[in-house]
């Protein structure tokens, strides 16, 4: 089946944070671990034929959380208009519990690592009322010069803010599920004492 473009469709996907200016960096301001920068409600168009939020919409919500984070450390519409942005290079989502229509979501984000042009971030999605963890989203993000079509180092001012965030976030214990590969994990059969003794003779 081939889908066609709806005449009423938006010309492109829009972020929840478009049009909002980035926050000026204040070295004296406290940095929370994790940062809580985005909240939303599960929308009707996010719900699939199983009656819960579709898997693609988890990435949509994590993307909005990333956009809120970008704005926090200095990347906004003006920055992108000047020719640079951040692109996703890799994403790993863990779906832990269902998110249902109308439920409130609370997102947190931690900066796990960085270098001169890449960020390793870890998002966590929670039910805003019960606090239950619904999903996690781990991303490798790359700073890009959109005119040159290649990765580029962060400007010094943004790098200083990112270094401050990373220094604070590195104080907390590492996220236990960060960096894990997808696999079917099977239980290893236990070896009985009798078998082990017999084999060793």
Task: Locate each region found by the language model.
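A generic structural motif
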Residues: 96, 126-128, 144
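Hydrophobic beta-strand-centered segment that forms part of the acyl-chain substrate-binding groove
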Residues: 69-119, 134, 201
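Hot-dog-fold acyl-thioester-processing enzymes
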Residues: 2-89, 144-201
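Generic short beta-strand
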Residues: 44, 123-125, 141
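A structural microfeature
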Residues: 135-137, 153
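Short, small/polar residue-rich loop motifs at catalytic or cofactor-binding pockets
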Residues: 40, 118-120, 138
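Conserved GNAT-family N-acetyltransferase fold
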Residues: 62, 123, 137
């Amino acid at each position: 089946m081939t889908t066609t473009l709806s005449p009423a469709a938006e010309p492109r996907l829009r972020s929840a944070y478009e049009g909002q200016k980035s926050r000026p960096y204040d070295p004296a301001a406290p940095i929370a671990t994790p940062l809580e920068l985005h909240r939303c409600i599960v929308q009707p168009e996010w719900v699939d034929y199983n009656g819960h939020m579709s898997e693609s919409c988890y990435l949509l919500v994590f993307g909005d959380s990333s956009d809120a984070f970008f704005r926090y450390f200095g990347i906004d519409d003006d920055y992108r208009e000047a020719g640079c942005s951040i692109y996703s290079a890799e994403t790993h989502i863990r779906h832990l519990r269902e998110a249902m229509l109308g439920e409130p979501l609370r997102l947190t984000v931690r900066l796990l690592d960085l270098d001169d042009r890449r960020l390793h971030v870890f998002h966590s999605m929670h039910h805003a009322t019960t606090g239950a963890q619904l999903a996690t989203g781990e991303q490798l993000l790359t700073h890009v010069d959109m005119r040159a079509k290649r990765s580029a180092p962060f400007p010094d001012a943004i790098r200083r803010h990112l270094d401050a965030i990373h220094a604070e976030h590195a104080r907390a214990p590492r996220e236990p599920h960060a960096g894990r590969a997808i696999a079917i994990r099977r239980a290893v059969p236990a070896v009985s004492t009798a078998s082990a003794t017999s084999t060793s003779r």
